[in-house]
From Swiss-Prot:
One of its GO terms (cellular component) is nucleus. Residues 122-178, 214-271 bind DNA. This is APETALA2-like protein 3. Residues 1-123 are annotated as: Disordered. A motif (Nuclear localization signal) lies at residues 110-119. One of its GO terms (biological process) is regulation of flower development. It is found in: Nucleus. InterPro entries: AP2/ERF_dom, AP2/ERF_dom_sf, DNA-bd_dom_sf. Keywords: DNA-binding, Nucleus, Repeat, Transcription, Transcription regulation. SUPFAM superfamilies: DNA-binding domain. The gene is AP2-3. Belongs to the AP2/ERF transcription factor family. AP2 subfamily. It comes from Oryza sativa subsp. indica. Its main location: nucleus. Probable transcription factor. Involved in spikelet transition. Together with IDS1, controls synergistically inflorescence architecture and floral meristem establishment via the regulation of spatio-temporal expression of B- and E-function floral organ identity genes in the lodicules and of spikelet meristem genes. Prevents lemma and palea elongation as well as grain growth. Regulates the transition from spikelet meristem to floral meristem, spikelet meristem determinancy and the floral organ development.
Amino acid sequence: MVLDLNVESPGGSAATSSSSTPPPPPDGGGGGYFRFDLLGGSPDEDGCSLPVMTRQLFPSPSAVVALAGDGSSTPPPTMPTPAAAGEGPWPRRAADLGVAQSQRSPAGGKKSRRGPRSRSSQYRGVTFYRRTGRWESHIWDCGKQVYLGGFDTAHAAARAYDRAAIKFRGLDADINFNLNDYEDDLKQMRNWTKEEFVHILRRQSTGFARGSSKYRGVTLHKCGRWEARMGQLLGKKYIYLGLFDSEIEAARAYDRAAIRFNGREAVTNFDPSSYDGDVLPETDNEVVDGDIIDLNLRISQPNVHELKSDGTLTGFQLNCDSPEASSSVVTQPISPQWPVLPQGTSMSQHPHLYASPCPGFFVNLREVPMEKRPELGPQSFPTSWSWQMQGSPLPLLPTAASSGFSTGTVADAARAPSSRPHPFPGHHQFYFPPTT
């Protein structure tokens, strides 16, 4: 395209007015070029006397306003063929948007009067709890949320919600399934109040999540027995009721505890009338009943008939420990003729007085109850075990020259009276050195 810029004076004739005159191209093709008479040239000089043609490059503002204001689905008026080539795509998309809005408006205009559906379940009134792993069903009544129970499947929870919705709101209630599925329930729920019907739905629900029990308050313990417990009672998380051999026994124990603390309105596994005149066992009273728990702090007094504190030794305890760990102390005077160490003196301070094949064998004199004393009888110890004295010789046992101990001297010393204690019952004799 070649532009010829010629300036034309405004005082010229009408024939010489500025215009766009596309002359035929030199090669005879279908294209053309624009010429602007800016230098005052006459169009007759070039022989260009073709009519003026106007092309609309953009849509008119009136057409755009009409499309934006009119929400109807009627298509816009057709434009001339040359102008359709330069039309942008956005008016047609605006028309499509208007059609889509008109199609969605009737469906979105109807809102549920019972609130939106649950986000965690496809059923109305059903919610999945990750903490317990169960599907729980709730219904709103008089501004309060009523718990209908926890179930293993979302389908069972949805069925419970439908029954409660029909009982609370009538046949026009929004339910999950068809109303014809509950014809048998409609005949039965007429004789029940709302509270009674809710209790029935709760009895049909699952108890605790852990275990495989279908009864409320019953779970399978890891030891293989059935555990019964109550939750949220006396300010505690749960109250332990005991272990039972059968699942039904645990369920009945839960029912008795629930009736005792919550009355006839308690949610039980079986009919509450079956527990008329039934009393909780004593074992359950000790665990569950918080009124009989004695929380007073005091020191329990010993029984004078069971303990004997007459100053005599009631038993011995023999410890085979290391000398460093031995701390046996004589706590009570044994007998006037028994010379013992002063009170508070450890026997480990004199390890040289006792020598035996078991070097860490020491005597622990301690007063123990008579009923806990083991029976002492003849015991088979090696004959080589004997208690000998080390250190300085005693005058009671004089030694001979180089031939060892004298037989007569040892026999006389054994018959002579001494300050040694009476022999301990058994094969061994213990010697306690005299106090200084």
